């Protein structure tokens, strides 16, 4: 008979032999992104590396909460979500870990990554002003700040202040203009609303085409998606809308990102870094740009023809992690302004 000690050694060897290859050949991703392009990139990565990518999809808030609950027992290796504010929330909750990667530092510009190496941008979206081409001309538009001018009374359609995209836009304005001026701006926009804030970005375009307001604020990704929608009605609507990049005479148009970070308790950290590095590569960045109407973060990769048709623009180079750092201040400002 074998001794108990020998059995333990054998059992440990069996466990190690069966688990190590598994960990060496997989990476587990919690993602808020839900696009066909992401599945294509997963398949490409697995084919190139032999590393299997397991995906759990959900809303950003749900995934962050799940990571909190799971703690050290979480199977997640990577968190991918949209908006720097959400990534900063995950960082502040202690759910991410710092990584060191020369590839990521080279591919992702400094202002588009966390200064502590906790997360990196993968794509960009510009938050632009869209306008009903039958009632507004580009020369009537200028800056985000101008949206508070009384000339736009009853003419603005916009999302709720609960929306992270609006929170990040206001956070950027607080960074540039200060708290008091940003509060005055938010109050001014509220006075100019054509209706109570509601719906998603696409709904704002639908509103101004339907005559509920003349201008709205949207992320460029939604414009691209509507332009290539399977719904002919959405294509018809977006053709009646013009795209304007604000603040070209000063700091540039506000941009936000989708990004990724390695989770604090990752069991496959090396594979996680490899996957994020792959997503920052020219091959992956080209697919993001051409198929999903997003701006690449990697220099030298061209946007799609549709995205280029909206024109080139100067983008705000504010360090993107600032949006998360000022998120709570932005939420307070919206509340004070009565922006619901």
State each model region's role.
Residues 74-79, 97-129, 145, 155-158:
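A structural signal for short loop-to-beta-strand junctions that line the ligand-binding cleft
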Residues 258-317:
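Mature extracytoplasmic/periplasmic domains
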Residues 84-95, 112-142, 170-171, 255-260:
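Periplasmic solute-binding protein
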Residues 305-340:
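Extracellular/periplasmic bilobal clamshell ligand-binding domains
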Residues 24-89, 340:
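Early extracytoplasmic/lumenal segment of secretory-pathway proteins
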Residues 30-33, 96-105, 115, 118-120, 131-133, 145, 153-177, 232-254, ...:
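Short beta-strand->loop
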Residues 172, 177-246:
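Ligand-binding pocket segment of bilobal, Venus flytrap-like solute-binding proteins
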């Amino acid at each position: 008979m074998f001794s108990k000690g020998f059995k333990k050694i054998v059992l440990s060897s069996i466990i190690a032999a069966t688990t190590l290859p598994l960990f060496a050949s997989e990476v587990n991703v919690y993602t808020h992104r839900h696009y066909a392009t992401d599945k294509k990139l997963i398949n490409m990565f697995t084919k190139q590396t032999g590393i299997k990518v397991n995906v759990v999809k959900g809303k950003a808030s749900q995934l962050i909460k799940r990571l909190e609950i799971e703690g050290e027992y979480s199977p997640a290796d990577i968190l991918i979500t949209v908006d720097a504010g959400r990534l900063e929330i995950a960082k502040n909750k202690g759910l991410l870990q710092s990584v060191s990667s020369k590839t990521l530092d080279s591919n992702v510009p400094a202002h588009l990554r966390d200064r502590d190496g906790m997360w990196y941008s993968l794509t960009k979206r510009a938050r632009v002003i869209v306008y009903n081409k039958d009632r507004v001309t580009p020369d009537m538009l200028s800056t985000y700040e101008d949206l508070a001018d009384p000339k736009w009374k009853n003419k603005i359609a916009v999302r709720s202040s609960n929306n992270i995209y609006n929170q990040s836009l206001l956070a950027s304005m607080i960074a540039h203009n200060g708290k008091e001026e940003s509060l005055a701006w938010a109050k001014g926009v509220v006075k100019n609303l054509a209706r109570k804030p509601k719906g998603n970005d696409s709904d704002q375009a639908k509103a101004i085409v339907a005559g509920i307001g003349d201008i709205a604020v949207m992320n460029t990704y939604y414009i691209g998606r509507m332009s290539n929608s399977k719904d002919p009605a959405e294509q018809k609507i977006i053709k009646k809308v013009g795209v304007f990049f604000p603040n070209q005479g000063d700091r540039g148009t506000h941009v936000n990102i989708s990004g990724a970070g390695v989770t604090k308790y990752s069991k496959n950290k090396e594979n996680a870094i490899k996957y994020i590095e792959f997503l920052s590569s020219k091959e992956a960045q080209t697919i993001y740009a051409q198929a999903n109407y997003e701006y690449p973060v990697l220099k030298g990769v061209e946007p799609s023809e549709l995205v280029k048709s909206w024109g080139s623009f100067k983008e705000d180079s504010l360090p993107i992690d600032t949006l998360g750092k000022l998120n709570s201040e932005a939420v307070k400002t919206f509340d004070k302004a009565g922006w619901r």
